[in-house]
Amino acid sequence: MTSTESSQPADRYVVVGNPVAHSRSPFIHAAFARQTGEAVEYGRLEAPLDAFADTMRAFLAEGGYGFNVTVPFKLQAYDLADRLTPRAEAAGAVNTMWIEDGLIHGDNTDGIGLVRDIQDNLDTLLEDKRVLLLGAGGAAMGAMLPLIECRPSRIVVANRTASRASDMLEEFVEAADSFGVELWGGGLDALEQLSEDDVCDVVINASSSSLHGEVPPVPAFLLGDGVLAYDMMYGAEPTVFLQHAAQCGARTADGLGMLVEQAAEAFYIWRGVRPRTAPVLADLRAALQAERKG
């Protein structure tokens, strides 16, 4: 996990998923390596759906230094780890792994990537703010502890199934109490019961709605002027949620910055060097736009 001179053979890392050909991680980590001078080789690895653990143990046994994990293997990665960080334990999933002292370590950098994008790239400090989190699946779970650690005044979780939101919040009551954060959860239909006094400063879509071209049923007054509407999904065009939020008057941002920031955290874990993310994010955004035009 120390810096490696560029004259030495490159240390090998991969992103593992199924499918994985679409992953932007090699683009990002190649840019980090050029910027920092770290001797890193980063590729893609498609593991069989029924052989994730065996595939990754073999990768490490053959000299691999570490790897990122994308769908559908984040829960299996959690089980593969010999040691878990507190944020991986809280998320119940792992996206970053490495060997240290002969043990496989697992972390989850998704949530810290989200809050760094919001606070550093979008200049929106979360302390004392009110946050509305849409969804209660794996993406939301990974975001909860890093959000709580930013000390917002309140986090509201709204999910299609109300009981799922309540169950998720129960996992974070102790952490929320220690940071002085109020938690509330319910079904998406409960948002209709909120008043304009309940408007949140930041609305984060952590649901899968954008994948299906659906807009979560969020009342328009919750997406008005002064609100940051954030979608964890990204693309060359704004998601349907962000298009809707913009029409309601909100400032909008997609999850591309989160992708870059979570990668930067993984790079730091592996190499002990923290890369600058702004130029990489700009280059990746430009590449997406070029692909759309091409």
Curated annotation (Swiss-Prot):
Gene3D superfamilies attached to this UniProt entry: Leucine Dehydrogenase, chain A, domain 1 (3.40.50.10860), NAD(P)-binding Rossmann-like Domain (3.40.50.720)
UniProt binding sites for shikimate: S23, R24, S25, T70, N95, D110, Y234
UniProt catalytic activity: shikimate + NADP(+) = 3-dehydroshikimate + NADPH + H(+)
Active site: K74
Binding site for NADP(+): G135, A136, G137, G138, A139, N159, R160, T161, A162, S163, R164, M232, G255
UniProt-listed Enzyme Commission number(s): 1.1.1.25
CDD domains recorded: NAD_bind_Shikimate_DH
GO molecular function annotation: NADP binding; shikimate 3-dehydrogenase (NADP+) activity
Enzyme class: oxidoreductase
Alphabetical GO biological process terms: amino acid biosynthetic process; aromatic amino acid family biosynthetic process; chorismate biosynthetic process; shikimate metabolic process
Pfam family, one: SDH_C
This protein's UniProt keywords: Amino-acid biosynthesis, Aromatic amino acid biosynthesis, NADP, Oxidoreductase
GO CC terms in record: cytosol
Record pathway: Metabolic intermediate biosynthesis; chorismate biosynthesis; chorismate from D-erythrose 4-phosphate and phosphoenolpyruvate: step 4/7
Subunit structure: Homodimer.
PANTHER family linked to this entry: BIFUNCTIONAL 3-DEHYDROQUINATE DEHYDRATASE_SHIKIMATE DEHYDROGENASE, CHLOROPLASTIC, SHIKIMATE DEHYDROGENASE
Function: Involved in the biosynthesis of the chorismate, which leads to the biosynthesis of aromatic amino acids. Catalyzes the reversible NADPH linked reduction of 3-dehydroshikimate (DHSA) to yield shikimate (SA).
Family, as annotated: Belongs to the shikimate dehydrogenase family.
Descriptive protein name: Shikimate dehydrogenase (NADP(+))
Originating organism: Cupriavidus pinatubonensis (strain JMP 134 / LMG 1197) (Cupriavidus necator (strain JMP 134))
